[in-house]
Amino acid sequence: MSATQPDNANKSPAHNSLVRDAGAPPAGLRVDGVALVRGGRLVQNALSLAMVAGEVTLLRGPNGSGKSTLLRTIAGRLPAAAGTIECDVPVLYIGHADGLSPALTGRQNLADWAMLNGLVDDDAAIDAALDRMQARPFADLPVRRLSHGQRRRVALARLTLGPSSALWLLDE
């Protein structure tokens, strides 16, 4: 597995604190010496990477190399077998499944997610999120009737309701 980043990606490591002074490095993520175990099998040993706010990083590698396990671990859904993960911004995660309720409309899914996470609770903000992902034309249909691509767009719209400084982890 490899992480593709700009050459300057390691110049500004992340800090644990959510409160930073004006001279602090940009917000970000630091993974240091992390070992990943999945199904009792070591899939990564001593993995390290750093990212700063605004970067886009692609994880690539063969099936079973630990890409999804790493994302789930950074998101706090799986424990690391060793090492440390520091992130000074909120983490928002979409896994293989989009986490949408199939019986609800896309709009209802966004409203419920916002309410459960203590975020915006107004139609204008939800419409703006749907517009950002070009999902408003099908937002009032039950999710079970949407194509896979339409579901992903609704799931991505959900993330845009979160904090603008959040780290997005998108798995496939």
Regions found by a protein language model. Name each.
Residues 58, 151-160:
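ABC ATPase nucleotide-binding domain "signature" region
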Residues 60-62:
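The feature captures the beta-strand-to-loop junction immediately N-terminal to the Walker
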Residues 135, 147-153:
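ABC ATPase nucleotide-binding domain "signature motif"
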Residues 75:
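Helix-to-loop junction immediately C-terminal to a conserved catalytic motif
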Residues 97, 102-118, 125:
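Q-loop/switch helix immediately C-terminal to the Walker
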Residues 123-138:
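Conserved ABC ATPase "signature" region
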